[in-house]
């Protein structure tokens, strides 16, 4: 309805050759002034040299002549327009939802989107920081696909450089400690996961490398490849346990092996040499300073391979319309330089970067700390032992990506209406149980009169708006908020309405069916089961 009203107003302005800026046209949901309200006449009256009340009245007359299923339109000084939806429109909304079923809320945007997320270094188990990026990325991909886009989910493996050297040294030292006292490198990873990896390595190779040194290139190569493989397999297993999938795992080291880094940098403009190093003039394109691509010792920087990686994505066979990267907030200093690099070849408009904030985990009022370096990492494995997948996905996604998440294990595990996820699943289970024991007559005309019915139906229709909004602002938490509001409205409706035996029973059952459909569709986008019973 909101879209219909907007389109009718735009059509009116164009037919009358009046000035309108469509981006400033606002149709707001209203509680006190009809179902929807707009100040469009106030905004554009001056530009069109028309009195705002007169313009509002003219718009009203035109829209009443359109087939918009509006019961009435009222004008309020100095030019507000209030729209009241026809009772028939509420019936139409419920019928539409039931008819479309699992397709209600879908669009056909048909953009190709490369979505890169998680991309954790294969130097240990996934922890809560990685978890948030994983959940955000997976849910966003679900919603973008539901909106008719083609989404390519990519995990970038940072398997090149100093962090991998540190991993090899750490695992090798822990392996040696199986046989004898052996010192850890100064920059060693200290987590239990490194000890676990060394033991895995021992199960495969026994004492084959007991007397080896990392100066032995063959030994170094085996420790490097096997350590990465062991951790990457665990990362994939953790993601699978959260129902998170990828289309491809891309390797940084593979970019170097196939000389794609060198080839992409060779065609990069605004490159210059200074102090025996090779630089990119990113300061010309919004970065704070120029950045080194190749150090004076000939070593490529991480930035150089990252540029190549982005060019490879853009020029891939998938041919994406744009890229979305989901990074931790600690990468904030990296955003400007990456966008600047793409600006050098006029591709910056193809990249959106989401920076998500930290997760703090609480249990019994105490916060768990996370530090892979200090051996106190709280991993996804640990969390899955305390709460289930559905709870993890809901509570990790219920805040905007740019806000801190405080994950309360006690609340997430609580079987109570205080738990928002339980409340939503309870509403779905209530609807499912009622419908399982009842029959809807689809041929009967639907009728909705009571205020709690029309409010609930209006909320159902908002599902389409929420989905579309998320495709534009990427704030997946809007879906959590919406589902909670819908569940609360339905639970109130259910508790305060006599449904079975009501003279309008068929309509109320149909409304219940519509609620069940929308709750299920929304939960599916979150990757959460819609429970039939609790």
Curated annotation (Swiss-Prot):
Keywords for this protein: Aminoacyl-tRNA synthetase, ATP-binding, Cytoplasm, Ligase, Nucleotide-binding, Protein biosynthesis
Tell me which domain of life the UniProt entry assigns to the organism this sequence originates from: Bacteria
Tell me the InterPro entries matching this sequence: aa-tRNA-synth_I_CS, Arg-tRNA-ligase, Arg-tRNA-synth_N, Arg-tRNA-synth_N_sf, ArgRS_core, DALR_anticod-bd, Rossmann-like_a/b/a_fold, tRNAsynth_Ia_anticodon-bd
Pfam families xref list: Arg_tRNA_synt_N, DALR_1, tRNA-synt_1d
A GO biological process of this protein is: arginyl-tRNA aminoacylation
Enzyme Commission designation = 6.1.1.19
Sorted alphabetically, which SMART domains does this protein's record hold?
Arg_tRNA_synt_N, DALR_1
The keyword Nucleotide-binding belongs to this UniProt entry's keyword annotation: yes
- UniProt keyword annotation of Ubl conjugation present: no
State the top-level EC class.
ligase
Q: Where does motif 'HIGH' region map?
A: 120-130
Q: What molecular functions are annotated in GO for this chain?
A: arginine-tRNA ligase activity; ATP binding
Q: Where in the cell is it found?
A: Cytoplasm
Q: In terms of one coarse class, where is the protein primarily found?
A: cytoplasm
Catalytic reactions of this protein: tRNA(Arg) + L-arginine + ATP = L-arginyl-tRNA(Arg) + AMP + diphosphate
GO cellular component terms attached to this protein's record: cytoplasm
Q: Which PANTHER family match?
A: ARGININE--TRNA LIGASE, CYTOPLASMIC (PTHR11956:SF5), ARGINYL-TRNA SYNTHETASE (PTHR11956)
What binding partners and quaternary form does the record give? Monomer.
Sequence similarity: Belongs to the class-I aminoacyl-tRNA synthetase family.
Its name, as the record gives it, is: Arginine--tRNA ligase
